């Protein structure tokens, strides 16, 4: 009888240990999201109106901490909280106001509504 109880106790301890290891391994494999992730993306535009529109679109996404677009190199410099948004969220917001990015393009309908000086050469 002692052997049966001892064997069951050993089996219980072994199963408990394996379950804890499996749970701990899953936690380690999860990717920790950065609260201050920095990205630079190319956004088409021409003027100060474009700059204001692009930056406002980026800031409309919850989790964007900083958004600065430069006319000279057409780069949007971002700092985002990846726990609240993704880079794709920002690209979609920018495209929704008429400005193409590398991954998301504005619809023709929205692009045509841009002011004349804001229309850029589309790829």
Region locations from a protein language model:
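Short, surface-exposed ligand-recognition loops at beta-strand->loop->(often short) alpha-helix junctions
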Residues: 41-50
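Surface-exposed aromatic
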Residues: 71-79, 109-115
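Short amphipathic alpha-helices in soluble, non-transmembrane regions
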Residues: 54-56, 89-98
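Sec-dependent signal peptide cleavage junction
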Residues: 17-42, 88, 104-123
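Sec/Tat-exported extracytoplasmic proteins
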Residues: 62-65, 97-103
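Bacterial Sec-dependent N-terminal signal peptides
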Residues: 1-25
